[in-house]
Amino acid sequence: MTGHDEALSAEELKTLEGLLARLDGRGAELPWPLFRFVNEVVATVNVDLLVQDAAGRVLLAWRDDPFGRGWHVPGSIIRHREEVGHRLEACARDEFGCDVAVADRAMAIVQIFDDRGHSVSLCHRATLRGVPGRRLVTGDRAPEAGDLRWFEAPPADLYPSHLVYRDVLEAAGRGELDGGAPLFTQHVGRRDAARDAPEGSISSDAALA
């Protein structure tokens, strides 16, 4: 990272290299500080599952974390050296508690710049293959993290970083997502997310110690 090596001392870089070598490409669970570090230096690649029923309702999950609260399209970060199909299956189990039928091709690509970082999501259409193992709430019942609810239209209290899914659902309703996967973008939060390109460069690649 020419011109920015001074951001980390030689000792800190050596420590970081040692930590990365210990992970050994296993996609292991990352400690929170290391996960935050990853989010600060690269974009994460995710899968999102847009589950709809025969009536066109969409199934959303309640999220409540330091970056906001609201209903969101369930998704998951692809682990290192993990195939997309495996992550789609894991996401379905984790978020819905049941299997889902997932379309082979992504219906949209969604990039989000927020206070957490920068994510690029492959959004796939999906339908449930069973009864969700997570709690389904209806009416005015107060949701808790992980609860699911069917919506005929995107609710007013969408998770702040998922407001872009209003555009995705509207485009899907007009039949505009049947022939490809267009890009949808959202900028949200206090950080400067409007930069088109990062500063600096990446130094020559080298094997981990």
Regions found by a protein language model. Give the residues of each.
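Conserved Nudix-box catalytic region and its N-terminal flanking loop in Nudix hydrolases
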Residues: 53, 57-95
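Residue-level preference for beta-strand/loop junctions
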Residues: 43, 69, 118-120
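Short loop segments at secondary-structure junctions
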Residues: 53-56, 64, 127-133, 153-155
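NUDIX/MutT-family hydrolases
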Residues: 125, 135-174, 185-207
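Active-site segment of metal-dependent pyrophosphate-handling enzymes
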Residues: 93, 97-134
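Conserved hydrophobic/aromatic beta-strand scaffold that supports enzyme active sites
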Residues: 50, 60, 123-125, 150
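Acidic, metal-coordinating catalytic segment for phosphate/diphosphate chemistry
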Residues: 2-48, 185-187
